Amino acid sequence: MYAVIKTGGKQYKVSEGDLVKIEKIEGAVGDTIELDEVLMVGGEEVKIGTPLLPGAKVTARIVQQGKDKKVLVFHSKRRKGYRKTYGHRQPITRLQITGIEA
């Protein structure tokens, strides 16, 4: 069984036991959270929401809170010798999917 969930402005296809890297969600490592923005549940019978499925939820356990890889942004102006490099590390949460209810 799989589900398509929406969190942090993005959509993820998840199955039970998957490790998923998502935008930061508040909570401590080991906490269990419920993701109730489920767009679709598939398996033997496919259910598609309009846009969300009422009563469907995905439960997950927080495995890690941290930062993603650094993204470098380089600015320059031609012929002027102006060069700047900026870096950004997005805060992320790693989840392990423990259950899907439809």
Swiss-Prot record:
<comment type="function">
    <text>This protein binds to 23S rRNA in the presence of protein L20.</text>
</comment>
<dbReference type="InterPro" id="IPR028909">
    <property type="entry name" value="bL21-like"/>
</dbReference>
<dbReference type="GO" id="GO:0006412">
    <property type="term" value="P:translation"/>
</dbReference>
<comment type="subunit">
    <text>Part of the 50S ribosomal subunit. Contacts protein L20.</text>
</comment>
<dbReference type="GO" id="GO:0005840">
    <property type="term" value="C:ribosome"/>
</dbReference>
<dbReference type="GO" id="GO:0005737">
    <property type="term" value="C:cytoplasm"/>
</dbReference>
<dbReference type="InterPro" id="IPR001787">
    <property type="entry name" value="Ribosomal_bL21"/>
</dbReference>
<dbReference type="InterPro" id="IPR036164">
    <property type="entry name" value="bL21-like_sf"/>
</dbReference>
<protein>
    <recommendedName>
        <fullName>Large ribosomal subunit protein bL21</fullName>
    </recommendedName>
</protein>
<dbReference type="Pfam" id="PF00829">
    <property type="entry name" value="Ribosomal_L21p"/>
</dbReference>
<keyword id="KW-0694">RNA-binding</keyword>
<comment type="similarity">
    <text>Belongs to the bacterial ribosomal protein bL21 family.</text>
</comment>
<keyword id="KW-0689">Ribosomal protein</keyword>
<keyword id="KW-0699">rRNA-binding</keyword>
<keyword id="KW-0687">Ribonucleoprotein</keyword>
<dbReference type="GO" id="GO:0003735">
    <property type="term" value="F:structural constituent of ribosome"/>
</dbReference>
<dbReference type="GO" id="GO:0019843">
    <property type="term" value="F:rRNA binding"/>
</dbReference>
<dbReference type="GO" id="GO:1990904">
    <property type="term" value="C:ribonucleoprotein complex"/>
</dbReference>
